[in-house]
Amino acid sequence: MNLRGLFQDFNPSKFLIYACLLLFSVLLALRLDGIIQWSYWAVFAPIWLWKLMVIVGASVGTGVWARNPQYRAEGETCVEFKAMLIAVGIHLLLLMFEVLVCDRIERGSHFWLLVFMPLFFVSPVSVAACVWGFRHDRSLELEILCSVNILQFIFIALRLDKIIHWPWLVVCVPLWILMSFLCLVVLYYIVWSVLFLRSMDVIAEQRRTHITMALSWMTIVVPLLTFEILLVHKLDGHNAFSCIPIFVPLWLSLITLMATTFGQKGGNHWWFGIRKDFCQFLLEIFPFLREYGNISYDLHHEDSEETEETPVPEPPKIAPMFRKKARVVITQSPGKYVLPPPKLNIEMPD
């Protein structure tokens, strides 16, 4: 494994999001099971940390942009800065939704439709952001997730306010449609991995990449679908599981997503105004890391080089010895005997 290349492709933004979601889901499961008695404002602490990092990073990036006009003429700089502003706007709407959720749980004084109102605004904004991202070749996973779930948000709000009395299995129909699409993606990667394994014209690196993608998608989608099914059955009263066993598949998916961030290129360079890859930024701040991080080992290659460089000792040379009777020649390699060729009699013509 090439650790240097692995960290060069590290995406710190996604890692922060998945880590905060993992910690939040652990605290939420413990709170729902009554193991901890914290306030929900404390349970949402990882979410507040996530949004705080977004706001601070965008503020610093905007300050660097304003103080350095020369940066605006650099290639994709304007596109990346606009993408950061779009992401900040969506995160602020999500922050408003999360604050309303905590207030509704703690005090219970207003309708869930009002709580979900920021999400109803997020969806059309996310659709516009996706159109802009496709035109400028930008990857916008969060925006796509918010845009395709507008119907799911409406159903959940209506069900929580008891305006509709459908079972949760029916309420989550838009979610099942989305998960069916993800299952097709998993099947697609599995089929292509099998085809690449059976093909002799594909190099080993491509086979390894497709197998890794297939395993990653399986480890993400299958546990996530399991979590959703268990949660819906619990809400409908079909099982009496505690929340921790239900959340375990979700934790597995989030851990896998965290692992995949080490092989994903991308990330906006304008967060905190660093304007470069995160690992390169760290190496410039902490130069001593270069001594330990910029080293690669190849034991097999080193062994082969040592074998090539080490001269092979030659066997001692022994003078040839001839014996007339046996007509045996002892060559320079002791112990190896070669019979001489038979005599040829060439008769000269008269």
UniProtKB/Swiss-Prot annotation:
Chief subcellular location: other
Pfam family, one: Tmemb_185A
Induction context: Up-regulated by erythropoietin (at protein level).
Cellular component GO terms held in the UniProt record: dendrite; membrane
Stated family: Belongs to the TMEM185 family.
Cellular compartments annotated: Cell projection, Dendrite; Membrane
InterPro entries: TM_Fragile-X-F-assoc
Source organism superkingdom: Eukaryota
Region (Mediates interaction with MAP1B): 298-350
Name of this protein: Transmembrane protein 185A
Subunit architecture: Interacts with MAP1B.
TM stretches of this protein: 16-36, 41-61, 81-101, 111-131, 177-197, 211-231, 240-260
Record gene name: Tmem185a
Native organism: Mus musculus (Mouse)
Record keywords, A-Z: Cell projection, Membrane, Transmembrane, Transmembrane helix
Tissue: Broadly expressed in brain where it is specifically expressed by neurons (at protein level). Also detected in some cells of arterioles, intestine, lung and testis (at protein level).
Membrane topology category: Multi-pass membrane protein
